Amino acid sequence: MGTDIGDLLQKRKIELSDLTNQVVAIDAFNTLHQFLSIIRQRDGNPLVNSRGKVTSHLSGLLYRTASLIEVGIKPVFIFDGKPPDLKSETLNRRKEVRESSLEKWENAKVEGDLEAAYKYAQASSKVDQEIVEDSKYLLSIMGIPWIQAPCEGEAQAAHMVLKKDADYVASQDYDSFLFGAPTVIRNLAVTGKRKLPGKHVYVDVELELIELEETLGVLGINREQLIDIAICVGTDFNKGLEKVGPKTALKLIKKHGDIHAVLREKGVEIKELDRIRELFTHPDVTDDYEIKWGKPDSEKLIKFLCKENDFSVDRVKKAVERLKVVSRGRQQTLDQWF
């Protein structure tokens, strides 16, 4: 997903406690996809209720969000709206990958290859409309604000940080910087150990802070040039130039100044180039939103999670109590939220 410019960015390790009392605009689609990919059984099957309905995303939202609130982080989730028509090719390609992965997952389970089954199961994850609606409802009864973006969620989150309605964007994708986000947190949804694909090697997944101005200063470019680099590499709206990775793209843009000059030099074109640039420099966003945190509704949480989705009553009650303890223990701070 997004553009592959991560190797160019200046990343700094931080702790959850560094985000205390900070408003974090979370890319909801990205986060839900992480939960659906990671919260699975050994053979790749997701968590489901007694009716076979997937609940991995609900588990992730409840327990991870509770952990964030417990350390004083103020989360607000941003949901994608209608995608730009230039994204249709990328969306079709993702659909093909999901369908292929689903078939490979089933074959791996039959063959008893649990490692392959888990890998392909992760790649088959899909955030559908039912998952989105259930997630919005759960956040509402948890007292967590969410915002419906008119188009790209990352663009809306970046807009909110630029307006100083939020302090950080949280997303795994790097598109946030192309939309102008000054500060982005990665790995907020999932930390700990992660197995590298196809290897018996585990790496630590830690919180990362990336600041746009720091990266631009180190690279010696401006935001428009970063957008041009991303377009050279490839974005959700276009295929990249052949055999051009982020480091080569950086050299090309610094040498020629902008992507138009690069394309002239190479004798190639990128269709709808100006429209692609416009999607990043002037994205479709809204100011029609309210960020307000509320108190968790214990009865509705128990009904929705335990009675309707077969969650453990004890675990849900403990999560609710954690939220209530925070509410009682930090009342002065929380009064500013509500």
UniProtKB/Swiss-Prot annotation:
InterPro entries: 5-3_exonuclease_C_sf (IPR036279), Flap_endonuc (IPR023426), Flap_endonuc_arc (IPR019973), HhH2 (IPR008918), PIN-like_dom_sf (IPR029060), XPG-I_dom (IPR006086), XPG/Rad2 (IPR006084), XPG_CS (IPR019974). NCBIfam families: fen_arch. GO terms for biological process: DNA repair; DNA replication, removal of RNA primer. Residues 330-338 are annotated as: Interaction with PCNA. SMART domains: HhH2, XPGI, XPGN. The gene is fen. This is Flap endonuclease 1. GO terms for molecular function: 5'-3' exonuclease activity; 5'-flap endonuclease activity; DNA binding; magnesium ion binding. Mg(2+) 2 binds at D173, D175, D236. It is an enzyme of class 3 (hydrolase). Residues 1-98 are annotated as: N-domain. Its cofactor is Mg(2+). HAMAP family: Fen. Keywords: DNA damage, DNA repair, DNA replication, Endonuclease, Exonuclease, Hydrolase, Magnesium, Metal-binding, Nuclease. Residues 116-257 are annotated as: I-domain. Coiled coil: none annotated. Binds 2 magnesium ions per subunit. They probably participate in the reaction catalyzed by the enzyme. May bind an additional third magnesium ion after substrate binding.
